[in-house]
């Protein structure tokens, strides 16, 4: 009878321990909605990583990338997230200053210059205005032309809630510096609306509610690959185009640090990177072969990018400057 009791106790302990390990082998990733959507890169990346890690990947998505850091700050050390994936270089110092992230100590072979030890890039792109060349026959060839023309209507994103919206703010600041407020005053006459995120604005553009929409130089690749149309084009401005580098980082509060580190290493793998050009419609950070559609894109050789510390120190003032110009 005593032996039977010991056997039953051992079975119960084994089942309890197995459940504990099963729960611990879940990797929770906070990201933005389009990354985790069924048409985004998330599902395929989840399947590929789960095959390798014998674990479960769970995406927790917010409406846009700019709100990711806010969500983590509100949750603090009680956050269920292991990894944050989706904000860009303009939030690096803000994120580091929360003291919620840990250095990843990962060596990656990137095709962009990167020196931050808390966050690793997973894709990059350049902002541009997208237009339909069957509707807009004479697109602007410079930011100056766009600012000064009176026959174009555009849709852009709010810099307080959207990373592309903030990107436009920094793009204009990079070109015009102290003259940015007067530029915004002129530009506002052309802006149909500011949307909270990219998805809303691009949808409105596709419904012909404006001549152009703020997006990326890579956006036409989507229409080439999935709609077999080349009528959507990206503007090419002589002043250059502002860059966006999207990153991922591990939280100190992660209950599965080794698994999180494994995923961070997985980011630079072919399995992860091959999903970026076709599903996230951005450039990969590794030298994989790009789809044919990307060979037809215009990518500016003049890449504009501000030091993250300068952005951190000035962002609030520049947003207030933008608000006052409305």
For each of these PLM feature ranges, what is it?
Residues 90-94, 206-231:
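A ligand-binding cleft/hinge motif common to bilobed small-molecule-binding domains
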Residues 128-135, 173, 244-259, 275-278:
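A bilobed periplasmic-binding-protein/Venus flytrap-type ligand-binding module shared by bacterial periplasmic
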Residues 251-306:
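Mature extracytoplasmic/periplasmic domains
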Residues 24-26, 30-42, 63-67, 80-210:
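Extracytoplasmic ligand-binding site segments that recognize negatively charged/polar headgroups
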Residues 112, 125, 184-188, 194-195, ...:
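Periplasmic-binding protein-like
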Residues 293-326:
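Extracellular/periplasmic bilobal clamshell ligand-binding domains
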Residues 43-59:
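Short alpha-helix C-terminal cap/hinge motif
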